[in-house]
Amino acid sequence: MRFRLNDSFSGKSWTIDNVQWTPQNLVAWIMELNIGLSDEAKLLLPNGMSLNETVLNSESDVVIYVLDQNLLTFTYDGDKIPSIPSLKGQPISNVLTGIIADSSSDQWKDKISKCLSLLSDILESSSKIHNQLSVCHDEYSTSIVSPEVAMNYLQRRQSGMKDLLFVFYERLDRVSVSDLLHDFLALPTGSLPITPLKILSTNWTKLDSWLNSISARYAEAQKRVQQCIGAANSIIVSPFKEVPSIKEGDDAYYHLRSVAQDAANILQEILKIESTSTTSQIKPKCNYETEITDCMEKLQSNLSELKSSRKSSLISLKSFWLSFYKVSLRYDALYEYLRQIAEELDRSKFVLSQSRNIFSLYIDILMEALRRTEWQESYNVSHDSSLPLDQEKELSLRKSWLSHFSNLLFNHGQLKYLPVLTRDEISNYLLNIQAHPNYQTFHQMLSNRLSEYLGFPGSPREAVSNTVQANNSLHEKLAMYQNRCNNLEAMLSHQNGFNYNINNDGLSPNAPHPPINEQSNSSQPFYRVSPSIVPLNVIRKLTNRKTSFTDSHILRLQDEVNQLRNELDLVNKRNEDLLIELQGKEEKIQYLETENEEVLQKYENLQEELSSTRKLLTKNEAAVAEQQSNEEMHSNEPNILNLYSVFEGKVDSLQELYNAFKLQLTSLKQKGEYATLAKDAEAVQHIIEERDYALAEKADLLKLSENRKEQCKILTQKLYTIVFRCNELQSVLRECVTQPGFDSDNERDGHASIPDRQIEFNSKDLQYLYWMDGEDADRNFQEFLNRMSSLDFDSFHNFVVSVLTQAHNHELRWKREFQSNRDKALKAILDSQSKVSLRNFKQGSLVLFLPTRRTAGNKKVWAAFNVNAPHYYLNTQPHLKLESRDWMLGRVTSIEDRTADDSTDKWLRLPSGTIWHLVEAIDERF
């Protein structure tokens, strides 16, 4: 890139080429120029936009105008014009004439050398004059254009201030802090050591007057903006004269060079001649002295006119720039005034926001006091070597928490050292505040926060109610399970006539409970060691309790729960013994498997028949395809009818097999019932289990039957296409047989002339595909055959293929777009990591830091190069070595917000109460 820095008054310019723009390079280059710029200097683009507000792109040429009142001290010396040597003493034509007249003279070579030296001096002087003419013309043009750039700058600032006033008007919030805090001040605190009056600032009553003063300052800002606009309109921008043309001087300069070069060439030729006898043959082509003299006069006169015009324009420009800088200073003061109003508005919005959320902040303060109390207790108990680190971490945590509260509304001295607060005190306060209907929302908020802190999913009362409900449901389940076990034991004892003991793998309702093994819980699964049922007396105690949980209550409740869990483990163990007994008796049911094997064998035979039928149909389909290519197609009609009859026979056989299978299932069911009735009374329980097992086997057989039916349906759908093709072939054959003079060509033509039929699907058509589900299978099958000719599988296949192809194309296109978008996102992320931030500074931002005129002690104060983000100061560290540097590009590691204080922060020169930012950064080297 190429940068050109223009002095708006004198028109001087400084240029740097072939650089890649970065803020530090630009600032370092301007500082190296040492042109006497002040801190209030403004760098503008031709459109009047400030360089601080612009992000330059990769343009090849960038023009920057400098506006600074210190540059008005420039004095223009327009009288000094470089002189050009004269040819009157030794004209070239006289030299040539003297050489021709006095051929015997030996001094002609010296004269020619002097003439050549004179011509060289003339060319050098004219080149200097021409360069001065070009520079003067460029500076003149720059100084004439600069007022327009300055006025554009003022117009942009006017529009920006108007927009800022509009934003201020929208952000003004005309509410009273006293009204917002009325309910909070009336909040009953009981015995809490933290009250609303203690945490509020002593000057919170003055906040309403402070908010009113902001509104008054806004009205004053409106007046000042109008005054600045009027002052800007009063600046007289007189129409400046156009820059004189330098075309005449350019023409004279180039003509002078041409004539002088011709004369020098002639003299060089004369020097090459050894004798003067042939010099008469060289004739000058023109009068060199006259032409060179005329060109020199034109060049000097053009430069003189341009300098005089520029001198007069600088006089008129100086009055304009003096007026402009006066108005600009007013704009700067107004901008500082508006900036202070903006800061006050930000602080007021923060105060009003915290006033509206005062109850939530009060809850935060209570929970912070509780956290500090418990942390101090754990800190006093522990004796770890990392205590200093824990203390430092706690201090930083408290400092960060305190920074979230406004010092205008809250008393930071009280918040910094909160009193001791325990869980019992907060629990008692919750019970007391529940009696006040106006603070139910606050009660709910505090209950939720306390529940979150204690680890409950809800409030303590909700936790108790949920526990009671869960215990009631578990108690009901336990009673139900106990009744079932008692009934089962009674049934078994009635069947066997005696009680089983524990050693014989049996159970007795009157038998004593076995001892509890304390180590058995660890080996049991998780559902066996789940929390037991809480008895009703414990639930009544919990519901009648008015105080919150304590550690002793929780331990007592845990002991009772453990006892009940042990009782439930005994019941579970008895159930496991019963299950072991039942599993041993399930082995007797294996005799049913022999009967099931016969059924499975019949199913396998049926599957073989279906496979053979499928093969036969495949062969028949191939035969039909061959018959279509045969010229004597009418002779195959009996074969088609036979195939159709064979198909009907196969379907009838399948139907018979299905009916036989249903009869077999019925007989098996009857056999199972007869066997169950024939069993002895003492084996009733075993028969019930056997029946359940038989029912499960029946369900499996039914599923297998359904699978076979699905296979039959698939076979039917495949036969649909064959029948449709056969019907088409049959219709063609009939038409061909009835036509006289039938031949193969006519047959093919007639077959090709059959119009294609498009199939329209509806819900009734789909019913025919599942004809086997109906009651009247024969009638449904006949309807199914009648509808077969209306389905076109080719059209359906083409439609499905087109949809899948389109979906595949969409997938490929989306993959390419995803790859492209991902590359763009990665590139944007990499670009953002190396881009210098000018506002919205945060941790990880790349910031340019520059030294200021202010000093703190013996060190300079460094500030961040910003756009509408002032008061960001660098925390200077020795390892940064800033004493020998003019700039630093750093990566922000942390930002600490502070408030200006006249006693400690005098070096900032900021109003008291102004928020400024201390930035920690590390050096970023490229």
Curated annotation (Swiss-Prot):
The modification Phosphoserine is found at S548, S552. One of its GO terms (cellular component) is phagophore assembly site membrane. One of its GO terms (biological process) is macroautophagy. Transmembrane segments: none annotated. Disruption phenotype: Impairs atg8-processing. It is a peripheral membrane protein. The modification Phosphothreonine is found at T550. GO terms for molecular function: molecular adaptor activity; protein kinase binding; protein serine/threonine kinase activator activity. Residues 461-496, 548-671 form a coiled coil. Keywords: Autophagy, Coiled coil, Membrane, Phosphoprotein, Protein transport, Transport, Vacuole. It holds the Pfam family ATG17_like. It is found in: Preautophagosomal structure membrane; Vacuole membrane. InterPro entries: ATG11 (IPR040040), Atg11_C (IPR019460), Atg11_middle (IPR045593), ATG17-like_dom (IPR045326). It comes from the Eukaryota. Involved in cytoplasm to vacuole transport (Cvt), pexophagy, mitophagy and nucleophagy. Recruits mitochondria for their selective degradation via autophagy (mitophagy) during starvation. Works as scaffold proteins that recruit ATG proteins to the preautophagosome (PAS), the site of vesicle/autophagosome formation. Required for atg9 anterograde transport from the mitochondria to the PAS. Required for nitrogen starvation-induced sexual development and for entering the dormant G0 state. Homodimer and potential homooligomers. Interacts with taz1. Belongs to the ATG11 family. This is Taz1-interacting factor 1. It comes from Schizosaccharomyces pombe (strain 972 / ATCC 24843) (Fission yeast). The lineage of its organism: Eukaryota, Fungi, Dikarya, Ascomycota, Taphrinomycotina.
